[in-house]
Amino acid sequence: MSTPPVPHSPAPSSFPLRPPAPPLDLPLIGHGYPALLRTPRARRWNPLASFGLVLAGLVGLLVLGGVLGALALIATSGPALLGAADPTDVTDLDLYSAPMVLLNNLLLAALIGVALLAVALGHPVAARFVHSVEGRVRWRWLARCVVVLTPLFLAYVLGAWALDGAPTAPRAQDWVWLLVMAFVLTPFQAAGEEYLFRGWLLLAVGTWIRRPVVAAAVTAVLSAATFSLAHGSLDPWILLDLAAFAVAAVLLTWRTGGLEAAVALHVVNNVVIIAVGTLVGTVEDSYVGAETAGSPAATLLSVAVVAVATALLLWQARRAGIARTVPVTVGARP
């Protein structure tokens, strides 16, 4: 009996194997938040495309808000509207009723979707990286920021209220609903503003500007201007207050590698102010509108508190070892 031939192993290839191509929608390893969208596939027109999407989203929300706002005003202030000598004069209408506050919160919360969609359609990087350099919301870090900030802002708001003479007024008829919305919906409203004015804006600017510090500085200026003017008041002290807040939020986003710290700062600030205002009957003073006026003392105190809060969060980020750049396990190699 003859033995079967021994199979020969194939000769080794003279061509080296190519490493697997990195996923096309990942940021580069080691990039900080401002540079997350700067990949080999990025193009100069990407920020313009996403800006067009943001603009379309804002126009859509304004139209929707105008229609729903008119219906809410008619429902809540119909007699005042019909009996007014000038139907376009809304000074006597209840702009701070539960339906109007609900509408405002939902429209601003929708900015989260606007920012994510603009990045998803306008840039070659997955939209989940708007949250952070890890491509996700770092919930434990977000909760830690809220816990750290809450005592500070309670002391600030209650102390400022006491120094102002502890003013009180009858609570609104729907104060319970206003209080519930302060805790349930206001966090999403605050997050919506951060995702647009800090998240999308910083990422879009960073696509054009290579140096992170320059990208953050340019974004801080743009964010301070747009964020301040978007609140409606042209009072210089209010504008300065809001601009300082915007700069702090940009700094936190850059130096912590994500939006969580800035969102926590905005959420705690808004929730504490609105909740206290609702309970003491001065909820209308909790919002910034066209008629809101500030003072040097109030602005100085507010800026000082935001500066302390920012320093606390940066310190906590170092202690917690929060990633500031894209980790090896998440990003693509250059």
Annotate each predicted stretch with a short phrase:
Residues M1-H123, E291-P334:
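N-terminal, membrane-interfacial amphipathic/helix-forming hydrophobic leader that caps
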Residues V180-R333:
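Transmembrane helix-loop-helix hairpins at the membrane interface
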Residues V114-F129, Y195, W200:
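Juxtamembrane interface elements at the cytosolic ends of transmembrane helices
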Residues L48-L55, V101-L102, L106, L142-V147, ...:
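Hydrophobic alpha-helical transmembrane segments
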Residues T39-S50, D92-V101, V133-V137, W141, ...:
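Membrane-helix interfacial "entry" motifs
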Residues L62, L116, R144-V157, D241, ...:
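Hydrophobic alpha-helical transmembrane segments in multi-pass membrane proteins
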Residues N105, A127-G192, L202-R210:
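Juxtamembrane helix-loop-helix connectors linking adjacent transmembrane helices
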Residues T88-V90, F129, A162-R171, D285-A293:
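Membrane-interface helix termini and inter-helical loops of multi-pass transporters
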